[in-house]
């Protein structure tokens, strides 16, 4: 997910730095874990998967997977199981799995939910227009960009909709208990969550696009206060971030 450029020329302001070396950020180590600690907390926002009336359960055969990917598939399934993000299931639902290569050379396990998405009633919650961000940031001189860690796994799925997330694999059938990458309405629900968390700071010093948070200020003194307020909100709501993908104190 992208946010507007700050024209800072900085590729990655945290490269080669430790968290404890960065002003303000060093006071919030718990917001930047190496991995998500487990299931997200209960909150009043849960993902619902409302279907077109009359829809029957959809099940697709697993895709064939090259043997060289099987060890990675098993590893990622075991990791998801250990966190409680998925669980074994016997279900009439089932979407196939595949891998997508990421920029850092790792592989993202993806579920092909296209058939489910076709029969899902679309959530029309508005996503912001990138162009609007520039008006809000006019006059700002100091910026920080915060990227949530595995953002989609930080929201739970409504209990009765969990079976619809079932996916098939060589190692069995599983269902997600948290939001899964690839479901049609996930950006809308995540935007709803972020708007609720940061609403009081909008049009002042924060813009949010799905799982990217941009903090902007007119001075370093302001930015110290603004960044601290944002990190306090993240800690309060147990929303975790990926330190290596963040940028702080850009000018």
Question: At which residue positions do the language-model features occur?
Answer:
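Retroelement reverse transcriptase polymerase core
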Residues: 4-251
């Amino acid at each position: 997910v992208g946010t507007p450029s700050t024209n800072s020329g900085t590729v990655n302001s945290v490269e080669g730095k430790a968290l404890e070396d960065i002003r303000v950020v060093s006071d919030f180590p718990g917001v930047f874990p190496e991995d998500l600690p487990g299931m997200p907390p209960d909150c009043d926002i849960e993902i619902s998967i409302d279907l077109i009336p009359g829809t029957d359960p959809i099940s697709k055969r697993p895709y064939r997977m090259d043997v060289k990917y099987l060890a990675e598939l098993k590893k990622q399934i075991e990791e998801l199981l250990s966190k409680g993000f998925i669980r074994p299931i016997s279900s009439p639902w089932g979407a196939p799995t595949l891998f997508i290569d990421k920029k850092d050379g790792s592989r993202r396990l993806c579920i092909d939910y296209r058939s489910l998405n076709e029969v899902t009633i679309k959530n029309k919650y508005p996503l912001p227009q990138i162009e609007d961000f520039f008006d809000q940031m006019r006059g700002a001189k100091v910026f920080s960009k915060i990227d949530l860690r595995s953002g989609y796994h930080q929201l739970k799925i409504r209990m009765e909709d969990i079976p619809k997330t079932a996916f098939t694999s060589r190692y069995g059938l599983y269902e997600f208990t948290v939001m899964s990458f690839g479901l049609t309405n996930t950006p809308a629900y995540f935007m709803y969550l972020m708007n609720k968390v940061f609403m009081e700071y909008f049009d002042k010093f924060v813009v949010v696009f799905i799982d990217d948070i941009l903090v902007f200020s007119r001075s370093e003194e302001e930015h110290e206060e603004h960044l601290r307020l944002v990190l306090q909100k993240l800690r309060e709501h147990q929303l975790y971030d990926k330190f290596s993908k963040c940028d702080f104190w850009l000018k």
